Regions:
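Feature captures the FAD/FMN-dependent oxidoreductase FAD-binding
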Residues: 76-119
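A general alpha-helix detector
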Residues: 65-69, 81
Length: 119
């Protein structure tokens, strides 16, 4: 078993730590703040808006002017895979108006990420 250190407990850092742990690595997640996912904590009016369920082409049309710049990043780990990762790890999700995706619990405490990261 190899060891992985992830620096930064934001959304990307938490997802990287979860993905590494699911592949059998021993993971240490380092974060300078007292809470993980500090910015994610305030999304969706405090309910933890984890992603958007819209088709990738629709997302590109609405969020960027240079689609080619973000294409590989978005298709390397798209919104469907984010949802699958969280649900497989025990965080049920729901999709609301505007294709916004939230934990079913509607809690902004990021418990779904914290539970996954502790296992």
């Amino acid at each position: 078993m190899s060891k992985v250190i992830v620096i930064g407990g934001g959304a990307a850092g938490m997802i990287a730590a979860i993905a590494a742990a699911q592949k059998g690595h021993k993971v240490i997640l380092l974060e300078k703040n007292e809470k993980l996912g500090k910015k994610l904590f305030i999304t969706g009016k405090g309910r933890c808006n984890v992603t958007n369920a819209a088709d990738m082409d629709v997302l590109f049309q609405n969020i960027c002017t240079n689609e080619k710049f973000l294409y590989s990043a978005f298709y390397g780990f798209d919104n469907t895979r984010v949802c699958d990762l969280l649900e497989q790890a025990g965080c049920p999700l729901k999709t609301e108006r505007g294709d916004r995706v939230f934990p079913v619990s509607d809690h902004s405490s990021l418990r779904c990420f914290q539970i996954i990261l502790r296992t």
